[in-house]
Amino acid sequence: MSSLSKEAVMVHEALLARGLETPLRGALLDRDTRKQRIAEHMTEIMNLLSLDLSDDSLAETPTRIAKMYVDEIFSGLDYANFPKITIIENKMKVDEMVTVRDITLTSTCEHHFVTIDGKATVAYIPKDGVIGLSKLNRIVQFFSQRPQVQERLTQQILVALQTLLGTNNVAVSIDAVHYCVKARGIRDATSATTTTSLGGLFKSSQNTRQEFLRAVRHHN
């Protein structure tokens, strides 16, 4: 991980220490090799489904899927893609809650590889540093771009922000629709799943917790 940013390494190590890192076998192959091998295996899967890859509509599908997996929907498996983060000195001594609501996210269920579609609310109480608001969105997006379970995703975002901001006072809530429930199995088109992860004052102070939960309910 020597070529990765300091922030990426810090977050990865913090997740490993807490048993919250996404299960990985080891070092990733280079990007082009991953695409090539995924395309080869996807070709075999499509052949097993008796799809005719000589058809012009299907011919490039294995390559498209490989590119989508590596460059887009699973790009968060590679810490080389971790967003560039700058923590700004808290010169204004902000000590009240900073909340960003309605952060859209699209992830992939690791059990069936179908879509998770939702929104996140993220809050923190600054200590020595503050973070650009768009970076909160980017961190949510980074961890969403992996095969995921919603509970782990929520905690990964929490620990990443705690690590970067140097404070436990972080809270994350995600409300999402799982297409493994909506599009298959029970085929429930209306249910949604909410997960919440609280740290520091958000867990120990009832008033702080309630202020955050009111913000969550506001966007719902």
Swiss-Prot record:
First-tier enzyme category under EC: hydrolase
SUPFAM superfamilies the UniProt entry points to: Tetrahydrobiopterin biosynthesis enzymes-like
Gene3D superfamilies: 1.10.286.10, 3.30.1130.10
Keyword Hydrolase tagged: yes
PANTHER family per the UniProt record, alphabetical: GTP CYCLOHYDROLASE 1, GTP CYCLOHYDROLASE I
Binding residue positions for Zn(2+): 109, 112, 180
Organism (species): Pectobacterium carotovorum subsp. carotovorum (strain PC1)
Presence of the UniProt keyword Nucleotide-binding in the record: yes
Enzyme Commission number: 3.5.4.16
HAMAP family: FolE
Protein name per the record: GTP cyclohydrolase 1
Reaction equation(s) it catalyzes: GTP + H2O = 7,8-dihydroneopterin 3'-triphosphate + formate + H(+)
Subunit structure: Homomer.
Gene Ontology cellular component list: cytoplasm
Family the entry assigns: Belongs to the GTP cyclohydrolase I family.
InterPro entries per record: GTP-CH-I_C/QueF, GTP-CH-I_N, GTP_CycHdrlase_I, GTP_CycHdrlase_I_CS, GTP_CycHdrlase_I_dom
UniProt keyword list: GTP-binding, Hydrolase, Metal-binding, Nucleotide-binding, One-carbon metabolism, Zinc
GO MF annotation: an example: GTP binding
GO biological process terms held by the UniProt record: one-carbon metabolic process; tetrahydrobiopterin biosynthetic process; tetrahydrofolate biosynthetic process
Gene transcribed to yield this protein: folE
Pathway in which the depicted protein is active: Cofactor biosynthesis; 7,8-dihydroneopterin triphosphate biosynthesis; 7,8-dihydroneopterin triphosphate from GTP: step 1/1
